[in-house]
């Protein structure tokens, strides 16, 4: 019988988040991938530095790459520091890569990183989503819906 996992293994520490992704895209399918990082990149991420606001993932030659993500140079690094905007390889099973390739081949679909985090075991992970871009009227509808829900909560709170 397997031992239950300690609570510390279930925690995840979010380092970078793409907050605009949920507003700009319809998110369909979610994936979790490991990232191949250098030592100074890991240290920089542990300090909470890093941005995935304008990044995306692409499938090339049976591999998935995180493109245009920014992990600044480690402040205490020496001449062996990393390049901040280099493409980073994502670690996935072949079955997951096939799902991504098939999803991206559909018209208008893209792979968007939602967050970079360290899991309970201290491994850097990326949460990806297969997404389709929203049009302007879709964004307006989302905003109206969010405002209406907020107004409903306010009315219920004031009544009760």
UniProtKB/Swiss-Prot annotation:
Q: Is RNA-binding included in the keywords of this UniProt record?
A: yes
Disulfide bond positions: none
- Provide the protein name: SsrA-binding protein
- InterPro entries assigned to the protein according to its UniProt record, in alphabetical order: SmpB, SsrA-bd_prot, SsrA-bd_prot_CS
Gene3D superfamilies given for it? 2.40.280.10
Pfam families tied to this protein:
SmpB (PF01668)
General function of this protein? Required for rescue of stalled ribosomes mediated by trans-translation. Binds to transfer-messenger RNA (tmRNA), required for stable association of tmRNA with ribosomes. tmRNA and SmpB together mimic tRNA shape, replacing the anticodon stem-loop with SmpB. tmRNA is encoded by the ssrA gene; the 2 termini fold to resemble tRNA(Ala) and it encodes a 'tag peptide', a short internal open reading frame. During trans-translation Ala-aminoacylated tmRNA acts like a tRNA, entering the A-site of stalled ribosomes, displacing the stalled mRNA.
Query: Which NCBIfam families is this protein grouped with?
Result: PRK05422.1, smpB
Q: Where is the composition biased (Basic and acidic residues)?
A: 138-160
Per UniProt, subcellular location reads as:
Cytoplasm
What GO terms in the biological process aspect are recorded for it? Answer: trans-translation
Q: Does the keyword Cytoplasm apply?
A: yes
UniProt keywords, alphabetically: Cytoplasm, RNA-binding
Naming one, the record's GO cellular component terms include:
cytosol
Major place of residence: cytoplasm
Q: Which family does it belong to?
A: Belongs to the SmpB family.
Species this protein is from: Rhizorhabdus wittichii (strain DSM 6014 / CCUG 31198 / JCM 15750 / NBRC 105917 / EY 4224 / RW1)
């Amino acid at each position: 019988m397997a031992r239950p996992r300690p609570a510390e293994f279930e925690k995840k520490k979010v380092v970078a988040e793409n907050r605009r992704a949920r507003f700009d895209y319809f998110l369909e399918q979610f994936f979790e991938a490991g990232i191949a990082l250098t030592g100074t990149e890991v240290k920089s991420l542990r300090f909470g530095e890093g941005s995935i606001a304008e990044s995306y993932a692409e499938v090339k030659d049976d591999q998935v790459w995180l493109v245009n993500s920014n992990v600044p140079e480690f402040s205490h690094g020496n001449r062996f520091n990393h390049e901040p905007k280099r493409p980073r390889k994502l670690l996935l099973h072949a079955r997951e890569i096939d799902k991504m390739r098939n999803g991206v081949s559909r018209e208008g679909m893209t792979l968007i990183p939602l967050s970079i985090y360290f899991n309970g075991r201290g491994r850097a992970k990326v949460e990806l989503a297969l997404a389709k871009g929203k049009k302007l009227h879709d964004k307006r509808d989302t905003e109206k819906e969010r405002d209406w829900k907020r107004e409903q909560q306010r009315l219920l709170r004031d009544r009760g």
